[in-house]
Amino acid sequence: MNNRFFISLAAVAVSLVSLPSCQKDQDSVFDGSLTERQTQYLDGFRSLITGAENGWAMYYFSGGAYATSRVFTVSFTDNEVTASSEDAPSVTAKSFYKVAVTSAPSLIFDTYNKVLHTYAAPSHSYYQGRGGDFEFTIENYSEDKITLIGRRAYEQQILIPLKESPASYLNKIKSFAQSFNLTQVAGKVGNGDVVIYFDLRNRFLYIGRLGAEDTELEEIPYIYTENSLLLQHPFWYNGTTFSEFSYNAEEHSITSEGITFKQF
């Protein structure tokens, strides 16, 4: 009995003495694995963005009082990015970038680029910029889509791999943006009538129940693809979720989820 008692005390003593050491070892292992995971995550991201043969389309959204959207293209080498914009498809701008962990895994365009800093850099007219970002938290990435969040405006940006040259793609975007001229459309969703108004200059649409007050309409930024309008975030109404509208110029209409909205 006494022997068992002393053995138990000894075991407890050894446990108490070794506990801090074990905890320290566990912390060390945890820290190491966290660092490894971060490194693997960033290495995977860097490999993805530099491995795209034609680069990426970047659906860029700015926020605040000057909110708008533009399609950029970005092509990455190990430390440089080459960018172009739908506003001038043949013009390119090259600068440095980095992929790093700051407060979170991030993609940072840390040297001036006249394309990528168009809405982020201050100027004489816009001393705080125009609601854009050049530092982004990496929200998620896969082979067919990357999502980023701006550090200042908190707007979501989307990158899609290009299947053709940047200039060819941007010329299609520019042509479509210039041809789209709808100002207001309406359609039936379930048993309800829905109206959509377009702010073509700033690239917003206002959507909601037909006859609703302006304050009841939801304001959603959109961006042009080659033949559609892609919403920055989906709109839900009467059990149907809308995220992208195809355009029919001849019919003066847009369609999503099998529902057509016509100009009126």
Where do the protein language model's features map onto the residues?
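Bacterial N-terminal signal peptides that target proteins for export
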Residues: 1-9
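C-terminal motif of bacterial Sec signal peptides marking the signal peptidase cleavage site
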Residues: 17-21
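Short, solvent-exposed secondary-structure boundary motifs
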Residues: 55-67, 84-90, 119-131, 185-189, ...
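Preference for solvent-exposed, low-hydrophobicity sequence contexts
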Residues: 152-156, 162-264
